[in-house]
């Protein structure tokens, strides 16, 4: 993957795909269209991805991996003080900087599983925080609160992205942080 040509080709494929995704649903995009727009052969596409859905999943994994790395940086160890605001701020800033990708990813016409994957990412992170705070004991109450929080956070982010991100990342972060601090974990 370190080969510059490989990186450049993958980038061209992703950009072409995202441009097409702005105009069409994922089900109506062909490898031939991506290849033509990226100025590559179809065979080159298949050297990098199995199909269009593999490409889509690769993009999802890339952006969700970045969100996960922000969490790891905000909560480096179990003995480290919890830094929820830092995580929220980094995440909303990243989403804002990549608004085109996120707007396309959360579009239900493209794939409803994206929101579910985002919920799963946040669930794993919130359960980790609760586990640290409760010395490894996650109660049934914690599980219900986690589901509630995740749906709320993802819903707020979906609304924020879907309405053109009128509020700044800092404003959204502060709102989410304030709401989360009011909950009894």
Regions found by a protein language model. Name each.
Residues 20-53:
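Helix-turn-helix
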């Amino acid at each position: 993957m370190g080969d510059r040509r490989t990186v450049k080709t993958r980038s061209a494929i992703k950009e072409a795909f995202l441009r097409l995704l702005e105009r069409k649903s994922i089900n109506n995009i062909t490898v031939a269209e991506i290849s033509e727009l990226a100025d590559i052969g179809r065979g080159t596409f298949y050297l990098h991805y199995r199909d269009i859905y593999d490409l889509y999943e690769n993009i999802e994994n890339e952006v969700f991996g970045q969100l996960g790395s922000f969490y790891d940086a905000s909560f480096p160890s179990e003995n480290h003080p919890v830094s929820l605001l830092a995580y929220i701020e980094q995440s909303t800033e990243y989403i804002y900087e990549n608004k085109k990708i996120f707007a396309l990813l959360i579009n239900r016409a493209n794939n409803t599983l994206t929101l579910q994957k985002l919920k799963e990412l946040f669930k794993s992170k919130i359960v980790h925080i609760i586990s640290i705070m409760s010395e490894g004991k996650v109660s049934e109450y914690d599980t219900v609160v986690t589901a509630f929080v995740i749906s709320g956070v993802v819903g707020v982010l979906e609304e924020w992205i879907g309405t053109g991100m009128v509020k700044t990342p800092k404003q959204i972060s502060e709102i989410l942080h304030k709401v989360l601090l009011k909950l009894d974990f």
